[in-house]
């Protein structure tokens, strides 16, 4: 099973922490892929940031789906 974790802000350091935590508890047959958008807010602190990040998250899911997709997506925020 492949699960894609999406950190909706652009912090690569936070994305790496999220991935490490998920891998610690994932089963042996679970592949964890963690991503964050290249463009968007560095932190989600307002309604504007949330709306901006939501578009970036949708684009990440669409791109992943077009490339073969994952079995599930987890948005690590909101």
Annotate each PLM feature.
Residues 1-56:
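N-terminal glycine-rich anion-binding loop in soluble enzyme alpha/beta folds
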Residues 53-78:
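Glycine/small-residue-rich loop that forms an oxyanion/phosphate-binding "nest" at active or ligand-binding sites
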């Amino acid at each position: 099973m492949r699960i894609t974790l999406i950190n909706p802000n652009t912090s690569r350091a936070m994305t790496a922490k999220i991935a490490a935590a998920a891998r610690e508890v994932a089963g042996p047959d679970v592949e964890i892929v963690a991503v964050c958008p290249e463009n968007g807010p560095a932190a989600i602190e307002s309604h504007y940031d949330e709306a901006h990040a939501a578009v970036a998250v949708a684009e990440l899911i669409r791109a992943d789906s077009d490339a073969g997709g994952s079995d599930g997506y987890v948005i690590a925020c909101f």
